């Protein structure tokens, strides 16, 4: 290894994020049990977010800066962190919030997880990053619409990491799930699930039938025509709930077809996190014009006036806009 070479240790990143997710889960549990208040706010274009969204993003941003601030990094999250919201939401006199945000001090880059043996190969876990731009894209709480209705299962934290212009590693973490599972890809080795209760990493067998369609659809409006179209598919389920991460995992692991509506737009964080996992099993996301989805650092990647559709078919995925 040359003296000036810089490497990105994937196991280290996974360790850091799994620790961060565990603290998010602890605070989210208090929200669910109504031990802490979770106020709602409305930002531009009538988009709603809660204190849990904002606090989670603050923790993730600070964690990334703590461990990777010395690298050429770019961070893009769904929520906008600013002084106005800091004064309202991050109350230094609130012990629960103070404890949650101070949990960053407990997060370590030490690799304390019992990774599978295949994760230990230097050629697999180290990525050369000399002069590379490392971008972190995340939706701190994907499924706010469901959360506000106290429907917790669709709620996830999405994190996608891009090195230069290529999606590299993605995380889909189930915040309110009773087992708080995390799904992620380990580049070149497949898709894994981490169960913090059992403390094990499980490589997932992806269900794929080239003659079958699986859909995860988001739309700005659930029209009668669209719902009628959905009903024409056998073994389909329609859910008027948010949570792209949940639908992604269901489509990959279950022998069902899932539909969801109600999302106003798809952020870069959604596309990047999903692409990292899908690329791992030989799938790509394509735009309607047939081009592969690009990862351009904009606030919103796609504005959907119609239907966004991830189509699993013959090992291709198309994103219809």
Where are these regions (language model features)?
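N-terminal subdomain of lithium-sensitive/metallo-dependent phosphomonoesterases centered on the IMPase/IPPase/PAP
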Residues: 1-141
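Short, Asp-centered acidic motifs that coordinate Mg2+ and/or phosphate
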Residues: 74, 169, 257-259
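Detector for glycine-centered tight turns/loop "hinges" at secondary-structure junctions
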Residues: 145, 165, 196-198, 290-292, ...
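Tryptophan-centered short beta-strand motifs
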Residues: 167, 201-205
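An extended, acidic
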Residues: 204-321
């Amino acid at each position: 290894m040359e003296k000036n070479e810089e490497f990105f240790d994937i196991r280290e990143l996974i360790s850091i994020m799994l620790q961060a997710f565990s603290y998010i889960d602890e605070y989210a549990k208090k929200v669910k049990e109504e031990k802490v208040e979770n106020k709602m706010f409305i930002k531009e274009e009538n988009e709603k977010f809660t204190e849990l969204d904002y606090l989670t993003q603050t923790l993730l941003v600070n964690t990334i800066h703590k461990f990777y601030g010395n690298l050429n990094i770019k961070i893009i999250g769904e929520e906008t962190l600013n002084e106005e919201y800091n004064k309202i939401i991050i109350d230094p006199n609130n012990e629960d919030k103070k404890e949650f945000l101070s949990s960053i001090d407990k997060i370590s880059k030490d690799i304390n997880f019992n990774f599978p043996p295949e994760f230990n190969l230097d050629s697999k876990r180290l990525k050369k990053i000399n002069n590379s731009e490392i971008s972190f894209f995340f939706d701190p709480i994907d499924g706010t619409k469901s959360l506000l209705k106290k429907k917790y299962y669709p709620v996830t934290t999405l994190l996608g990491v891009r090195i230069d212009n290529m999606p590299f590693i993605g995380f889909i973490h189930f915040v309110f799930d009773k087992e708080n599972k995390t799904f992620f890809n380990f580049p070149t080795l497949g898709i894994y699930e981490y169960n913090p209760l059992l403390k094990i990493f499980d490589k997932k067998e992806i269900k794929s039938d080239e003659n079958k369609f699986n859909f995860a659809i988001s739309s700005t409006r659930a029209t009668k025509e669209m719902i009628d179209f959905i009903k024409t598919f056998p073994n389909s389920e329609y859910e008027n709930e948010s949570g792209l991460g949940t639908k992604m995992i269901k489509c990959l692991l279950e022998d069902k077809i899932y539909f969801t509506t109600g999302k106003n737009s798809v952020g870069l964080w959604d596309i990047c996190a999903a692409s990292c996992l899908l690329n791992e099993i030989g799938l790509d996301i394509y735009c309607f014009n047939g081009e592969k989805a690009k990862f351009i650092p904009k606030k919103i990647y796609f504005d959907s006036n119609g239907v966004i559709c991830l189509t699993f078919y013959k090992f291709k995925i198309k994103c219809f806009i």
